[in-house]
């Protein structure tokens, strides 16, 4: 089952197909597993800093190895999936990411940590472009925003559980054995992905209806030239803010007197709020539009970070779910807008480019904010994070104007044809 097969229409009338539901569930499961693997690293960073005497900049570099490689391999993974098949690529990438955790558990030096993180980034690069394009192809048309919102929401489900479980395992059996256990979970997930997608019968599992040339279509040229770059820029800033904040949140909590169990609980609370934010903001984006939702989420993110800095540990923990709602809520709006800006035949590449930009920004931002933290301190660096996220607000306003102009032209075209 390849992306090409899933994205190619057949001209048949669309009808309910259990294959669509299976594709969505497998994509959601893969997203939850991979995001759980990725975000468990936040819990390990303070332990590595203590064991290997690392600076904030070095911590940022280690984090960037994983996310940077993951960003760089997004487009190649999507292209390779067209040859090998989506099932094999998703399962194989998951297995590689799991093996990386097994290697993390056996690492005795920073060099081995770096090798394991690079390997994990390669494995995790397969998930986003392949799963997103499969879901968008399976739920073509207006339903794609809701389906992609569900897929995006699923990524936070594992985040709500894995940090707390990992923190408990570290306290009981050490971080090395915990890494091994997480790797075994990943291998089991890889097998489940392969078996589940094999049950979907090749190209007949998902059918994308062909639109006739007479169907009303927006001005794709204008959307690609003007709208998609704006959306990508908003996504880059949003991702850089999220990854920068999450990377240094454990260190901020440490400075407030938090121990490892409290840090694990804090991450779980952020991710729980993030899951709720993705679900709620997906509905808000569909009802209110891009601009009001981005104004709400990004403004609340900046305000939440500013409020968090002076609070004691108890009040900080209570605030974190609210920050999580705002921190992750924007992404549901952004992911769901990609199909509105890109024609179906270019969607796989667009998702690859979008994820390359956003994940790449998430990889680079911890390094830059780490350098700032070493130079000016942790609190001023987090103040900078809060300031930069506000740059998304004028960009969202411009994107809304592009979308409104295209919608106006489409309505005018329809009115002329009626007359």
Question: Residue spans of the language-model regions?
Answer:
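Extracytoplasmic gate region of multi-pass secondary transporters
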Residues: 41-42, 227-275
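Interfacial helix-cap and linker-helix signal at transmembrane-aqueous boundaries
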Residues: 48-49, 80-81, 168-173, 253-254, ...
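Structural signature of the two symmetry-related core transmembrane helices
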Residues: 88-102, 292-306
